[in-house]
């Protein structure tokens, strides 16, 4: 038989995986948000984001928003597998995503007690969409931004970046149009992961592997040019 490691992707690095694959979807979201803010002539360092979710995509979107764009993350949300409900976690000085990574389990459940001790305010899971923010990043569940939840959105919101698959319903799309909110659709916004899977196949075929910076630079170019 022939050795063809590129037939499936998302492999560990030792088995022919690609650097940057873990971060790719979340960082891809941020590359598209950066371009949207440029288009709208908004200073990313003065912007605030509210994020739904704290799985892989939301984690790296939060990190990217703070570390790459210089913005502030007002909140993230997560499903608490112990309480069987979702919560929103916010902090008056902005969420520290690197800290939250130290208190989240492998399933995306944030340690509620540790968060409270660190000064985080814990609210109902739907509270994320009500926050005073310039950018909303739904990165959790399909259809959560809909005719009902858009009524709770702050008038400050200028960008909705679809980190999840299908997080916004057609009714939400109509709301965005009516209120001049710039919507980055999921098939572009969250394409960083599948694009980097393609990069993984390319590297497998060449049997030559790029550094993380090389992968992420190529991803940025592919998504924004």
Locate the predicted segments by residue.
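Generic secondary-structure signature for well-ordered alpha-helical cores
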Residues: 1-5, 34-42, 66-71, 81, ...
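Structural motif
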Residues: 5, 48, 71-75, 134-135, ...
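A short glycine/serine-rich beta->alpha loop
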Residues: 13-21, 182-185
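Glycine-rich phosphate/diphosphate-binding loop of Rossmann-like nucleotide-binding domains
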Residues: 20-23, 27-130
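Short glycine/serine/threonine-rich phosphate/pyrophosphate-binding segments
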Residues: 57-61, 144-148, 168-170, 191-193
């Amino acid at each position: 038989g022939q050795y063809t490691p590129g037939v499936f992707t998302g492999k560990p690095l030792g088995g022919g995986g690609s650097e940057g694959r873990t971060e790719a979807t979340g960082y891809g979201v941020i590359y598209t948000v950066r371009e949207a803010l440029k288009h709208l002539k908004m200073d990313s360092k003065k912007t605030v984001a509210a994020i739904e979710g704290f799985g892989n995509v939301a984690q790296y979107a939060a990190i990217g928003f703070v570390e790459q764009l210089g913005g502030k993350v007002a909140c993230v949300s997560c499903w608490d597998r112990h309480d069987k409900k979702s919560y929103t976690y916010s902090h008056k000085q902005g969420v520290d995503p690197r800290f939250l990574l130290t208190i989240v389990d492998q399933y995306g459940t944030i340690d509620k007690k540790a968060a409270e001790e660190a000064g985080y305010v814990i609210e109902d899971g739907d509270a994320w969409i009500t926050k005073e923010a310039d950018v909303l990043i739904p990165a959790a569940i399909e259809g959560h931004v809909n005719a009902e939840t858009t009524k709770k959105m702050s008038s400050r919101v200028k960008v909705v970046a679809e980190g999840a698959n299908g997080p916004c319903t057609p009714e939400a799309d109509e709301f965005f149009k009516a209120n001049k909110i710039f919507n980055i659709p999921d098939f572009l916004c969250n394409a960083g992961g599948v694009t980097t899977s393609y990069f993984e196949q390319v590297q497998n075929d060449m049997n030559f592997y790029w550094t993380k910076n090389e992968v992420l630079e190529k991803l940025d170019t592919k998504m924004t040019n």
